């Protein structure tokens, strides 16, 4: 018979993790975390379960999580099924009336309710809504220009029903959070003209984070964070450093608008924004509750 009474090393590790997390839990109790969950991060059911468990845990330790989700790939798939061609300008989907209807159907009727269901299965209570509900997010039309290659003249491009938040009424989210539930927001908004507008999910999350005075804005995506020229993760950045990395070409492509959202958020009063890989198990908890963190944290320095 074994006389070894030493604790299980795995249990010790778990206990040490909790001890390390405690000061962070105390620090963030009562604060708001806005979490943007990208459409590209939704493909793995196991990762979806991990995400839902993380959100429920945040709520359980006294943090108020607010989920804003994307759904670009899913919208594109539905449009293809319906025989509707997708066209993009500066990464924004050109949205005519038919595309706007499809986007609202996919985002509000499918993805939003799926995330609410994940959270319920993880033991939480979530309420799905869009920016249209209670006129929570009023959008204004996004305007873009493109240089004509023949005339070399900048010309206006009509993106259709693509909007950006002009005004946010936080009362709907506050009411849900104070009731002990978790708001899950689809990036659809109402315009002053009464039309429905499709809003970039990163932009929506950043605007909501500013309106709520969030402690953290998390952008969960399918990359580890911001990488340097050697493809190594950059753990901390300030707006000034981001400008320098853009100028020398280190930051390119789709990472630029994400960082613009982060900079806008921290300049608007959000304590910090983080870009991290939503496919990594419990990456958000690692970022929030450990010294090392995960992903790239953007702050004012």
Swiss-Prot record:
GO terms for biological process: arginine biosynthetic process via ornithine; L-arginine biosynthetic process. Substrate binds at residues 71-72, 93, 198. Keywords: Amino-acid biosynthesis, Arginine biosynthesis, ATP-binding, Cytoplasm, Kinase, Nucleotide-binding, Transferase. Pathway: Amino-acid biosynthesis; L-arginine biosynthesis; N(2)-acetyl-L-ornithine from L-glutamate: step 2/4. Its EC number is 2.7.2.8. One of its GO terms (cellular component) is cytoplasm. It is an enzyme of class 2 (transferase). The keyword Repeat does not apply. The keyword ATP-binding applies. It is found in: Cytoplasm. It holds the Pfam family AA_kinase. GO terms for molecular function: acetylglutamate kinase activity; ATP binding. Belongs to the acetylglutamate kinase family. ArgB subfamily. Catalyzes the ATP-dependent phosphorylation of N-acetyl-L-glutamate. HAMAP family: ArgB. This is Acetylglutamate kinase. It comes from Rhizorhabdus wittichii (strain DSM 6014 / CCUG 31198 / JCM 15750 / NBRC 105917 / EY 4224 / RW1). The gene is argB.
